[in-house]
């Protein structure tokens, strides 16, 4: 990094912070974690991408910047204005940390945006290793309890790590059901997988690993079941702390009702949709699987993963389990202890 390139300005409008010191401390930690300099300012000092916190409902004058990551602490509609590359919304003050990470990965480990539909959220970020290929492909499906405030930036770190290990990474964004409906979400992840056939890279489509985190674990394993007879299908499917039993998830009100909010109804009112969508109900999948859990995660998710592993084994699926220390995000963190075991298992299957 050069002195200029490792600097990030966070341009904040007056009055957006309830306590400026708290925000400054959070920003300092986030910058330090990535080896960056910068801080909260009134105006940007360079020409690189900046983080802008305009305040609720305010417009960003994008003509002032080459590229912007916008942050709104509360929930709001997405800002699709020109030059706004990403909009972090609804994540509270911690949105600043996510924004700094987004700038870091975009600046130092850029990918190529590939669209698979007409809607702005129908896109993936492709990263390709050095060399000629063809490369095995890791398809990444982010979680966030199917809510629109969570986007594919959650998978940036693991995408960069896997690319460095020799995998092309296909980091999928999709329309979430809280804003677009359950069928739209299901259709988007299927379309994103199928779009690998026309991806602008040398890819080995016989070596696809489909990796989903949290709610993305449900989407990934449901997609695996749906793709068995399709032209593009995974050779290995990973659940990373996945919500693999939607009936149990609904009964236990996981994520403050995240399952029924996503599907649009409780299990008793929409049993057919739940059973079509729940990986537990789709067994056997007929594709090798790896079920990954961090033992410090929500005990409901840990229990669901263990129950799913037992059921998949009983259904004669080829399935393995990896458990290790950490919380919910350890399974997508390349610096975590469990990550070493995850990539070793994937390498053994595909490399």
PLM regions: where:
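C-terminal catalytic histidine-bearing segment of alpha/beta-hydrolase fold enzymes
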Residues: 2-10, 44-46, 50-53, 292, ...
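Hydrolase active-site cap/lid region
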Residues: 222-270
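Short alpha-helix in the alpha/beta-hydrolase fold that links the catalytic acid
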Residues: 23-25, 301-311
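The feature captures the conserved acid-bearing segment of alpha/beta-hydrolase catalytic domains
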Residues: 248-251, 266-302
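Gly/Ala-rich beta-loop-alpha elbow adjacent to hydrolase catalytic centers
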Residues: 212-216, 220
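Short, surface-exposed "cap/lid" segments of acyl-processing enzymes
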Residues: 12-19, 130-161
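Catalytic nucleophile-loop/oxyanion-hole region of alpha/beta-hydrolase
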Residues: 150-159, 170-207
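N-terminal cap/lid segment of alpha/beta-hydrolase-fold proteins
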Residues: 4, 15, 19-38, 73-132
């Amino acid at each position: 990094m050069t002195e200029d390139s490792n600097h990030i300005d966070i341009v904040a409008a007056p009055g957006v912070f309830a306590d400026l010191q708290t925000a400054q401390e959070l920003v300092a930690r986030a910058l330090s974690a990535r080896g960056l300099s910068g801080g909260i300012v009134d105006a940007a000092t360079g020409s690189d991408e900046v983080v802008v916190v305009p305040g609720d409902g305010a417009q960003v004058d994008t003509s002032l910047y080459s590229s912007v990551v916008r942050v709104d602490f509360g929930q709001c509609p997405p800002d699709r204005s020109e030059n706004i590359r990403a909009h972090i919304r609804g994540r509270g003050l911690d949105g600043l940390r996510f924004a700094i990470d987004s700038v870091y990965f975009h600046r130092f480990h850029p990918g190529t945006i590939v669209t698979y539909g007409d809607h702005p959220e129908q896109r993936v970020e492709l990263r390709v290793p050095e060399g000629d290929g063809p490369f095995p492909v890791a398809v990444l499906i982010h979680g966030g309890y199917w809510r629109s405030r969570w986007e594919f930036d959650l998978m940036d770190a693991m995408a960069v790590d896997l690319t460095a290990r020799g995998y092309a990474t296909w980091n999928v964004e999709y329309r979430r059901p809280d804003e677009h409906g359950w069928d739209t979400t299901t259709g988007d992840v299927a379309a994103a997988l199928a779009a690998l056939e026309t991806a602008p890279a040398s890819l080995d489509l016989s070596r696809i690993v489909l990796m989903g985190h949290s709610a993305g674990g449900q989407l990934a394993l449901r997609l695996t079941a749906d793709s068995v007879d399709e032209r593009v299908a995974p050779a290995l499917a990973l659940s990373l702390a996945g919500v693999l039993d939607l009936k149990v998830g609904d009964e236990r009100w996981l994520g403050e009702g995240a399952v029924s909010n996503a599907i649009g109804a409780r299990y008793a009112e929409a049993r057919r949709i739940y059973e079509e969508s729940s990986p537990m109900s789709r067994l056997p999948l007929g594709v090798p699987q790896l079920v990954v859990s961090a033992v410090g995660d929500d005990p409901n998710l840990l229990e669901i993963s263990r129950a799913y592993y037992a059921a998949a084994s009983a259904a004669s699926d080829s399935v393995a389990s990896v458990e290790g220390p950490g919380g919910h995000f350890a399974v997508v963190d390349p610096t975590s202890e469990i990550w070493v075991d995850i990539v070793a298992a994937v390498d053994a299957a595909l490399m």
